């Protein structure tokens, strides 16, 4: 698989930095490929802008910067407004329609999956696992990481008392991703 640039963006408290760490480690540790991770967030602990950048490749990554993401996960309108126009035309955008209302910045993107990540997480019992639902969707939609690798990495990073909830969130993401892809074809 060629270089794949992945941008996860939303607001602090949605767990997207952790999501990026989980994804990068899944690829590097369990799929034995190259991965970089970079994060940034506003000065607020929660509620400010947050982004997580992951680059995946089969060869050494010499330029660890994302310019035009192949994959874009947006969990706020601000994220779409700021980064949507940079997504590659043949890329993939995954948006939470409960949080993103205006998709104009994604007009050039051919594959936009509208999946209620936060609502799915809420139905599972805690919206804090929306990031894990998103990782399930991203796994199915992109093939950039194997299911086994993402499952192991999620379990490496979540508290023991939340393992079952996080497993359910990941499975719900796999299912929602598969359904969105089937509906788009």
For each predicted feature, which ranges?
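Active-site cofactor/cluster-binding pocket
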Residues: 1-185
């Amino acid at each position: 698989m060629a270089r794949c640039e992945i941008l996860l963006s939303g607001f602090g408290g949605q767990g997207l930095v952790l999501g990026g760490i989980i994804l990068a480690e899944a690829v590097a540790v369990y799929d034995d490929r190259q991965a970089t991770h970079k994060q940034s967030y506003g000065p607020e602990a929660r509620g400010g802008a947050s982004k997580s950048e992951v680059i995946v490749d089969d060869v050494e990554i010499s330029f660890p910067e994302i310019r035009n993401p192949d994959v874009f996960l947006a969990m706020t309108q601000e994220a779409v407004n700021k980064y949507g126009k940079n997504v590659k035309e043949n890329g993939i955008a995954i948006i939470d329609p409960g949080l993103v209302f205006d998709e104009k910045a994604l007009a050039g993107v051919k594959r936009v999956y509208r999946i209620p990540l936060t609502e799915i997480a809420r139905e599972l019992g805690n919206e804090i696992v929306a990031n894990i639902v998103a990782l399930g969707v991203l796994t199915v939609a992109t093939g950039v990481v194997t299911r086994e690798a993402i499952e192991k990495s999620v379990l490496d990073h979540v508290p023991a008392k939340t393992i079952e909830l996080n497993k359910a969130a990941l499975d719900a993401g796999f299912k929602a991703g598969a359904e969105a892809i089937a509906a788009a074809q």
